[in-house]
Structure formats: structure tokens, C-alpha cells
């Protein structure tokens, strides 16, 4: 697998299932650590302030920033896309508020 980049979308092994997720950790960390920070993309839409709407591979879903977690890079399988710039800014804004930074 090539370099894992922030805001790329991968299919990721998760408890015997493979689900889409967004990489949130910075590229500098992704280069040297064996794991990345990811947020799952879920089809179950909820009106939470930590959720961001996304359309990926023709399907509507939400990036669940409230469910972010570390994942070993070896669990990342197929890269299926990259998040659009406007959505990246929205994610960054929510993370700043979430962590009060």
C-alpha cells in the first residue's frame, strides 16, 4: 500500500467487517507510525453535531467524528476516494470545537 494521507477514504477491517473510514491523522504521523486515526462512515444518519454528511461511491452517509479511533495501517484495504476540500474544512472545524483548540 502507498502512503496513507489525511482525508483519504479507505475500506477498513473492523470487528470482522469491512467498513469505509476517513483518515484524520496528519501525513507526518502517518509516515512514521504503524497506525492512523480514523472516523467511520456510517449509513445510519443521526442529527449529531459531530457528524458530517458525505456521498462516497454513490452512497449517502455520515462521517462519525464521535466514533473516531486508532486503526493499524495493515487494516486499511482499498482506497476508495478522497474527501472534498469543503468537507475537509468542515471536519477540521468540528475537530477544533470537539477538542476545544
Regions found by a protein language model. Give the residues of each.
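Conserved functional hotspots at enzyme active or ligand-binding sites that engage polyanionic ligands
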Residues: 1-101
Amino acid at each position: 500500500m502507498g502512503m496513507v494521507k489525511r482525508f483519504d477514504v479507505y475500506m477498513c477491517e473492523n470487528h470482522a467487517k469491512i467498513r469505509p473510514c476517513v483518515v484524520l491523522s496528519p501525513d507526518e504521523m502517518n509516515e512514521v507510525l504503524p497506525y492512523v486515526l480514523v472516523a467511520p462512515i456510517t449509513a445510519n444518519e443521526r442529527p449529531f453535531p459531530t457528524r458530517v454528511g458525505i456521498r462516497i461511491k454513490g452512497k449517502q452517509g455520515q462521517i462519525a467524528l464521535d466514533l473516531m479511533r486508532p486503526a493499524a495501517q495493515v487494516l486499511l484495504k482499498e482506497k476508495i476516494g478522497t474527501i472534498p476540500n469543503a468537507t475537509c474544512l468542515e471536519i477540521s472545524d468540528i475537530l477544533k470545537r470537539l477538542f476545544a483548540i
